[in-house]
Regions:
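Hydrophobic, Leu/Ile/Phe/Ala-enriched alpha-helical segments that form helix-helix packing faces
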Residues: 24, 31, 80-88, 135-139, ...
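A generic structural motif
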Residues: 169-177
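Short glycine/proline-enriched coil/turn segments at helix->beta-strand junctions
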Residues: 89, 108-111, 139-143
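Catalytic cores of nucleic-acid endonucleases
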Residues: 118-170
Length: 177
């Protein structure tokens, strides 16, 4: 499955979400087998170092940590396009899941950019601040969005960043669906 897609209709996202969820189910079954057939130390070594999970889009075997990170980023991106579609219902969007420079979500011929991530903390790897600074430097685009999920970002944090970066809409999802 391509890691760059153009979404013309919000219903097109269902195919990708279903693929991701099916591959996560496959991964859960593989993980259960590892747990059933190994002691704790061996199981955790396998989880960390071997390709024992299913990559969420391609279905190829991949490292568990990569699968966890990719699945959540893909799902956040889908949720972001669903969010943007409510604001811009006639706009087609490009979702870029490749690991290359650029933005995660851009319109087909429009003035919107978005970045997406999930992390154990919004401070992890400085991702939020790096994205916001990069957005602030982009004076050509008028609609900028940061979409993410974590467990410790509060309304106080949002206000702090909103004051610092007033031209960027920060959207912290409450759950990943």
């Amino acid at each position: 499955m391509s890691k760059q897609i153009v979404v013309h209709n919000i219903n097109e996202l269902d195919k990708y979400k279903n693929t991701i969820l099916n591959n996560l189910n496959n991964s859960a079954n593989m993980l259960q087998q590892v747990l059933n057939n190994n002691g704790a130390l061996d199981a955790f070594k396998i989880f960390k170092f071997e390709k024992i999970a299913t990559e969420p889009l391609s279905g190829n075997l991949e490292n568990l940590i990569e699968v966890i990170n990719q699945a959540h980023t893909y799902l956040i991106s889908i949720m972001a396009v669903e969010y943007l579609n409510k604001l811009y219902p006639t706009q087609a969007f490009i979702i870029d899941w490749r690991n290359i420079p650029g933005y995660d979500i851009e319109p087909v011929g429009g003035t919107i950019i978005a970045e997406c991530f999930s992390a154990t903390s919004y401070k992890s790897n400085g991702k939020l601040v790096a994205d916001l600074k990069r957005f602030a430097c982009n004076t050509e685009v008028e609609n900028k969005y940061e979409f993410f999920y974590d467990k410790d970002f509060t309304e106080n944090h949002k206000e702090y960043y909103r004051e610092k970066y007033p031209d960027i809409e920060i959207v912290k999802f409450k759950d990943i669906k």
